[in-house]
Amino acid sequence: MSSMNLRRLLPQRAKQERPQPESSKKKGFLERKKDYVERAKDYNNKRDTLKKLKLQAAFKNPDEFNYKMISSKLVDGVHSEISKTSLKKEQIIDIKTQDILYLQSKRRADDKKIERLQATLQYMDSGLEPTEQIIYVDDEKEVKNFSATKYFDTVPDAFNGSLSTIPKISKLKEGSLVVNPKTAPTLGQLEAMTATSYKELKERKLRRDQLFKAEMDLSKSKIQLKRGTKSGVTKKVGKKEVVFKQVRSK
């Protein structure tokens, strides 16, 4: 076996780069090849970027509109964004007033829907659990002469068992119709309708409360904006938070 082959079989010592001599440290950092490669890549990337930018600037139309023209400005030669909240105090108050009116309209619409749902649920509940009404009379003669249609001001068809409520003749004249037993919903359908309606009622009440809270917060911020001062300042005193409020002296 030759000496060259034997040298390959022996463990080789890891190559180490020459350290920087103490005498040349004052001249600066001793650049290795890996440092040169990184520096060359960075230089080439910057050169290519500048070349592309110069090409774009050469072909750019000076009259071309760009939204940056109205959303930024030059401050000491540096482009800076224009603040979008530079509104006058009166404009902010008007915006908050419009928001409050919008929330009020939505809350009133929810109130009407809640009232309709509650009325519908009362009708369904009365259909699921019919109740009896007891009428007291003085003697047997009144019992014999008692007329339910006259007493309740209704029609005889109102007592056939298919109605959950007894309609008045005045309501019937307005156009209300007696429920047809053939088209009346079954007990299972009524239970399903009731469960769905109760769920919707709960969601609408929650939404109404959230709208009311948002409306109150907007009203409070609007009042504070008009006054120009905060109603209370919260500061930490030790481990507790204390709210300081300005009290008007008599």
UniProtKB/Swiss-Prot annotation:
InterPro entries: SSU_processome_Utp11 (IPR007144)
GO cellular component, one term: small-subunit processome
GO biological process, one term: rRNA processing
Region of interest called Disordered, as start-end residue ranges on this chain: 1-31
Superkingdom of source: Eukaryota
Positions with biased composition (Basic and acidic residues): 14-31
Compartments where located: Nucleus, Nucleolus
Keywords tagged on the record: Nucleus, rRNA processing
Function: Involved in nucleolar processing of pre-18S ribosomal RNA.
Membership in a protein family: Belongs to the UTP11 family.
Subunit text: Component of the ribosomal small subunit (SSU) processome.
Protein name: Probable U3 small nucleolar RNA-associated protein 11
Organism: Dictyostelium discoideum (Social amoeba)
